Amino acid sequence: MNREEQRLAQQTMAFVLAGGRGSRLYELTDRRAKPAMYFGGKSRIIDFPLSNAVNSGIRRIGVATQYKAHSLIRHLQRGWSFFRAERNESLDILPASQQMNDENWYKGTADAVAQNKDIIEGYGPKYIIILAGDHIYKQDYAEMIRHHVESGADVTVGCIEVPRMEASGFGVMKVDTEDRILDFIEKPGDPPAMPGHPDQALASMGIYVFETEYLFKIMEECAAVPGYSHDFGGDIIPTIVRGGKAVAHPFSRSCVRTVNEEAPYWRDVGTVDAFWQANLDLTDFKPALDLYDTEWPIWTYSELTAPAKFIHNEEGRRGSAVSSMVSGGCIISGSSLERCLLFTGVRTHSFSQLNGVVSMPYAIINRNARLTNVVVDRGVVIPQGLVVGEDPALDAQRFRRTDSGVCLITQPMIDKLDM
């Protein structure tokens, strides 16, 4: 980061939209918002945009919460309380609250910002960067802010190339040769292809940079239009594209990579399959996302636990793990793991076999269990002798099984078993 980028970051406030449920994760988000979902053995999803902001030199951050916010708020209080007001630093948790007009829910992404206008203006940032709180990536926001200032844009939109057939869940844009946005379509049924790349589309990452004064001005103008949906992708960005200057910022320009990361990494882990795959990808010999990057750390709350322990060394009862990540507080007692990722405090008991398992914290895998391609929710107690991943029809009756064969197991599902 050069001096100019550092100066711009100090003039910027980050506003993180962290109120979404993530309904395609099904029971995993019954008790927590999607940004509070676990990822990578010890982190939460929200730790990634927050770490990007801190590592980029941004020290004023607001986090808007709404759906099932307790788990998220508790995590932020425990893991992100190191900001010092005397150093002009703060992280404000901004739950939806009753306003003068008696409305108390955020009606959309733009409304979350509008309802906190007084707090934002109280800090007086010249620039504001709007961030989605539910994606996995490493990015230097200071570089994106510099691009915004140098281009003279009214808004700069972070963008990434995605397969066209997967782009209908994003805002999709058309750009000219200088990255000026010519059209912006929110969640199109038939996403337009990129010129020369018929199978690719240019999708919004849900990251926007504005001058703060301009943002509130354009929001007031949009709010006066009948049918206003209080949404950045549905209202604010298309309005600027039509009457102002909107510029696309390719993620490849500001993504953070180590020598071990071959391509820019950005994931929306919004389905059970995507969540399972992205976690297990971290166990690869050369993972696409390098969490061992000490130059760009992912800050989080770290529980005080003992180191992981592996015990027993008998034939058929050997505590072992291959191509796996095992977090602190875990005890692998006479069981075998292959390509697994275990969060804090998981216990696996003798003769159990785990292959392709992602386990949330403090789950217990009892003796003789065999689990293949499974996501285990926090605190689940797997009964002795349970077999999952070998009988698709039976798995589908008892658990949530995806089309690709990944099974999600929660405690209420276990409680219904006749064993």
Curated annotation (Swiss-Prot):
Origin superkingdom: Bacteria
Keyword Nucleotide-binding: yes
Manganese found in the keyword field: no
Record InterPro entries: ADP-Glc_PPase (IPR011831), ADP_Glu_pyroP_CS (IPR005836), GlgC_bac (IPR023049), GlmU/GlgC-like_hexapep (IPR056818), NTP_transferase_dom (IPR005835), Nucleotide-diphossugar_trans (IPR029044), Trimer_LpxA-like_sf (IPR011004)
Reaction(s) this enzyme catalyzes, per UniProt: alpha-D-glucose 1-phosphate + ATP + H(+) = ADP-alpha-D-glucose + diphosphate
Main EC class the enzyme belongs to: transferase
Assigned EC number: 2.7.7.27
One Pfam family it belongs to: Hexapep_GlmU
One GO MF term attached to the UniProt entry: glucose-1-phosphate adenylyltransferase activity
Keywords annotated in UniProt: ATP-binding, Carbohydrate metabolism, Glycogen biosynthesis, Glycogen metabolism, Nucleotide-binding, Nucleotidyltransferase, Transferase
Residue sites binding alpha-D-glucose 1-phosphate per the record: 106, 171, 186-187, 204
Subunit: Homotetramer.
Family: Belongs to the bacterial/plant glucose-1-phosphate adenylyltransferase family.
Protein name: Glucose-1-phosphate adenylyltransferase
Organism: Roseobacter denitrificans (strain ATCC 33942 / OCh 114) (Erythrobacter sp. (strain OCh 114))
Organism lineage: Bacteria, Pseudomonadati, Pseudomonadota, Alphaproteobacteria, Rhodobacterales
